[in-house]
Amino acid sequence: MLRIANEERPWVEILPTQGATIGELTLSMQQYPVQQGTLFTINYHNELGRVWIAEQCWQRWCEGLIGTANRSAIDPELLYGIAEWGLAPLLQASDATLCQNEPPTSCSNLPHQLALHIKWTVEEHEFHSIIFTWPTGFLRNIVGELSAERQQIYPAPPVVVPVYSGWCQLTLIELESIEIGMGVRIHCFGDIRLGFFAIQLPGGIYARVLLTEDNTMKFDELVQDIETLLASGSPMSKSDGTSSVELEQIPQQVLFEVGRASLEIGQLRQLKTGDVLPVGGCFAPEVTIRVNDRIIGQGELIACGNEFMVRITRWYLCKNTA
């Protein structure tokens, strides 16, 4: 699946699949081909952001106006005026300004990245852009609230489900002792380098799946609860049922979410082991750590040979000071 930045994840749910046209701008979530572009600095309420324009768009715009796209051969004030004219629809819609003291630079976009793509036209020249380093509220000012009519285009939207890379068991005492920077070893649901993960379907059903590069998902195993799925992997700690145990020593199932997958709801009604379905979605830049479906932290997935661990970058559990 594709990767996506945290600040762009809400737009996957807000924007229709085919995108939305708002004023002179067309917005859509899509993977843009890896290529060179030109990066401009904008100012939105004293916050700086970056607008990436595909190199072909910028080159055609400059050559159509002054016969060259060579920045070193263009007077800086003239270059600023050309850029401001080309970016005018975006700047006007967002109430941002182009920074004159920050000259444009060359920059390539990222591979396998799902990003918010913004398109507009000036004097029959088409511009394709991606926003880097978003100022707070910048795109909210562009989009505002999408109309109810647009949201009703899809009466049965895809089902979005969490994708888990692995799990571990930790007692309440162990969870309480975790601090930022520490590493937690995880048991994977399969070889994640090959695309093996687990997902949680509606109704509390879990599945072990294989994700492929051509955006399909094969269902290798379907179970009614997460404990059954965990038991088929690494051995879980079990009590002998006779000795007493303190509450703080009871192991908790910790799941590590690495992204979200979307499936058509109609395809899930007769789902069985071995089925292969088309899938959308994206991987998150950080691992989300869950206990009983509650988020308790975030971290970075790190490979250690054939083993994997998550280094804690955010931790939300409060220590008991009583």
From Swiss-Prot:
Gene Ontology molecular function, alphabetical: cytoskeletal motor activity
Protein name: Secretion system apparatus protein SsaQ
Gene: ssaQ
Cellular component GO terms held in the UniProt record: bacterial-type flagellum basal body; host cell cytoplasm; host cell membrane
Function text: Part of a type III secretion system.
Family statement: Belongs to the FliN/MopA/SpaO family.
Keyword RNA-binding: no
GO biological process, one term: positive chemotaxis
Organism, as annotated: Salmonella typhimurium (strain LT2 / SGSC1412 / ATCC 700720)
Keyword tags: Protein transport, Transport
Any Pfam family the entry gives: FliMN_C
Domain of life: Bacteria
